[in-house]
Amino acid sequence: MFYIFAAVVVFAGIYVLGFNAIGITTCIFLLLLVACAAADLNKGIIPDLIVIFIAVLAVINFFINETFSINGLIDHLIGAVCVSVPMLIVSLLIKNAFGGGDIKLMAATGLYLGWRNAVAGLVIGLFIAGVYSLILIIFKKAGFKSKIRIAPCLAFGLGAAALFGNLIVRLLFGW
């Protein structure tokens, strides 16, 4: 099943973005998100190695796909901080709100996507996680204090932001 989903993700990336440098790096990014989601579902942990691969891909992507500028660099650096630091603060204030892997994943993906798309991906991912949690509570599969694995939800939101980021940002925020 994993292979079928991975193939669909690659097809979607190439279909939406084309068979070029942007499309290929985005497909690699999407496959790494699928690996994070699968690892979180199976083991309850996001491997640091996958997060490091995403961060390295972000640096490679910046030099391949972006016209190098100080503003572009700042946009991506802010992306790493603006989504992960609030998650870290919430996690420190509310025990078990987010796992360390989720926070590191958001830092690396923020570096890859830039701040606007990272925020959009986080909003979508947390919305999906909220709906999923609500369904679990309604059907008495979990309680309000239960821990859920949100990497699959975040991966979906971040993947959507990678493929349709500008459209999503305009629809959500009007930027």
Describe the predicted segments one by one.
Residues 1, 128-139:
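Alpha-helical transmembrane segments within multi-pass membrane transporters and channels
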Residues 1-20, 170-175:
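N-terminal transmembrane signal-anchor/hairpin module of polytopic inner-membrane proteins
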Residues 3-8, 51-58, 103-105, 150-155:
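Core segments of transmembrane alpha-helices
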Residues 6-10, 61, 83-87, 128-132, ...:
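Alpha-helical transmembrane segments of multipass membrane proteins
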Residues 14, 18, 42, 91-95, ...:
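Membrane-water interface at transmembrane helix exits
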Residues 24-131, 171-175:
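Functional transmembrane core segments of multi-pass inner-membrane proteins
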Residues 135-160:
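Interfacial loop-to-transmembrane junctions
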Residues 150, 156-175:
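C-terminal domain-closing interface element
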